[in-house]
Amino acid sequence: MEELDITSVGQFQTLVRYNNPVLVVKHPDKKGGAPLTEIEMKRPQTAGALLDTKRETEEILNSILPPRCWEEDGQLWQQSVSSTPATRQDVINLQEMLDTRLQQTQARETGICPVRRELYSQCFDEIIRQVTINCSERGLLLLRIRDEIAMSMEAYETLYCSSVAFGMRKALQAHEEKEMLRDRVKTLELDKEALEEIIADMKLKQEQAERRNAELRASEEKKFTEEITFLKKTNAQLKAQLEGITAPKK
């Protein structure tokens, strides 16, 4: 079996078709003794050299989808994307596998869903792989589209994170301002109560002053009335005496 199923690639799960993993071994260089890294296949290699077009296609595929490396049991493994052309049945299987994975992972059908986005990205990568094998120019064009979409998504995520951070800062600022306004309202309410007490005290003093003034005015009016009455009486007596003195005797 030259290639793995698209559901079990090494220790990963992906919709992209990969070759069988190969073991990466290190051995000293014959000249300088420095360690060199090369790929040692676990299966016998096919006889003969690869065609230039196939080698070029594999290089393009490796540039689009770089080989994956991981370490297992102290050994380094590497896995490159498959260069086998896809059949119509492979495309149907890819669609079915995508739907199955979407259901298994319970990905959201609408809205923002990282799981759904990852699965569709894997599906798009597999489509790019299939197209690149048949036409490298078309595959590179799809690669540009994929990178543009990824760049746009990163920009949207950055903008979203910035908006969320800005909203949180504004909400925190509004909360702080709200607390400050509450403290200000409490202070103003205390000032209002103090002023109301002052006003009530001043009203009481005003009423007392008006009452004292009314009593004083009534007392003064009574005093003046008595003086006027006394003066009128005295004036009448003096007038009568004056008339008695100045009247001719008979």
UniProtKB/Swiss-Prot annotation:
InterPro entries: Axonemal_dynein_light_chain. One of its GO terms (molecular function) is dynein heavy chain binding. Residues 168-250 form a coiled coil. One of its GO terms (cellular component) is inner dynein arm. Keywords: Cell projection, Coiled coil, Cytoplasm, Dynein, Motor protein. It is found in: Cell projection, Cilium; Dynein axonemal particle. One of its GO terms (biological process) is inner dynein arm assembly. May play a dynamic role in flagellar motility. Belongs to the inner dynein arm light chain family. This is Putative inner dynein arm light chain, axonemal. It comes from Drosophila melanogaster (Fruit fly). The lineage of its organism: Eukaryota, Metazoa, Ecdysozoa, Arthropoda, Hexapoda. The gene is Dnali1.
